[in-house]
Every structure is written in structure tokens, then in C-alpha cells.
Amino acid sequence: VVQPMLSGGGGLHSTTEDYVRFANMLLNGGEYNGARIISQATLDRMNQKFIGDDVNRDAFFFGPRGDWGLGFHLQPVPGADNDGPFNFGWQGVGGTVFIVDPVNDFFMIYMAQVRGGPRGAPMDLTLSQRAVYEAMLD
């Protein structure tokens, strides 16, 4: 390696099955199949807002209603305000999205291998999330 490149998600690969296990573990408060993977206290800390109110949120994945915890984006669940409660997850550069909603007791995983939409335009994957919420909560 001539010059190392630091990239938080660069080179991470997973199967859909393992992604489901991961999201299920997070939905269950850090436990999977009876084994404690991450403490509830750590998961709770990761889901607290860590970005100050003075930061412009226009460029966030989910607009001004979005926020950031430690390793997750945070988004108020439908019907909530910016103080929560929140769902949490991540949107990868290649199009993969996962959202865990402990309030409504479900997770959503959207697997794609695209980099931007047509001609490089950013994809609006929030449309998929909105459709899932509308189908489940109506």
C-alpha cells in the first residue's frame, strides 16, 4: 500500500442473511439467539443525539429531521417530533439501507448495488422507507 485510505465502511461486505441477523440483534436490544452481543447501555448511548443544534442538517440523509448518534443516523418515527422517539440505522454509499425501529418493533433492510441514481443523481431511498411504514402502520 503506497498511501493508506481511511474509510469507515470501505471494504465491508455482508450477506443478506447476516444483515438480517445484525438488524435483529439491534432490534432485540443487543441480544441475538440468547447471546448478549452488545450491552443495552452501549446501544442506548449509540442512539443518543450527538450533533449540536448549530449544525445545518440540510445535507443529512433524512433532511432537517435527521440526526446522528454514534454510528447510526437517527430519524423520528412517524408521528414523533425531533426529540424522538427515533428509529436508527445506516445508508451505505452503494445503496444498502437498514433501519431499526424499536418503537414499532420491526426492521427494514434494502439491499442494492448502485452508486447514485440515473446519471449519478442521488437516490431517494426514503421512498422505500415511507412505503414500508405506510403498509405496516395503516
Model segments located where?
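Catalytic loop of the DD-peptidase/beta-lactamase superfamily, centered on the K-T-G motif
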Residues: 1-138
